[in-house]
């Protein structure tokens, strides 16, 4: 239909390391349908060397400047997008908001409610199994606790449409 504009939906995920963000992103990508955009995969493919959290933050910033306009265009054209990255800070969620608002698209913030004990156990299992598609590497207990200090659950004043996934 000429002149008709469809807009996709942006889905993104908030959860601690080991909560199951990538697993949920893949599930969503297969059921919505949607294009899954995996930050870790892109950073790896683009050749960024990640040896520290600081390296990851720098690479992530460059990745976002590259992928943001593309994701907005996909959404504007009616393609739904699942962001497989940690929407764990207010700043990271503001970035996604800018992407979907630029496309006048809908959104859902998927929040994974998992205990630290569950996340640590999942990280231990993932470190042992080394499944394909996991690019951040070995997540030690020290790394988990180091990145968890930056975790900020979504606040009501952020005004996101939230769907909570309880992992107990």
Describe these PLM feature segments.
Residues 13:
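Hydrophobic anchor at the beta1->P-loop junction of P-loop NTPases
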Residues 1-5, 31, 148-168:
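NTP-dependent small-molecule kinase module
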Residues 16:
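P-loop (Walker A) phosphate-binding loop of NTP-binding proteins
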Residues 41-43, 113-119, 168:
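Conserved nucleotide-binding/hydrolysis micro-motifs of P-loop NTPases
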Residues 59-103, 107:
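Glycine-rich phosphate-binding loop used to anchor ATP phosphates in small-molecule kinases
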Residues 102-152:
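A glycine- and Lys/Arg-enriched "phosphate-lid" helix/loop adjacent to the NTP-binding pocket
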Residues 10:
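Walker A (P-loop) ATP-phosphate-binding motif of ABC ATPase nucleotide-binding domains
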Residues 19-79:
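Conserved substrate/cofactor phosphate-moiety recognition/catalytic segment
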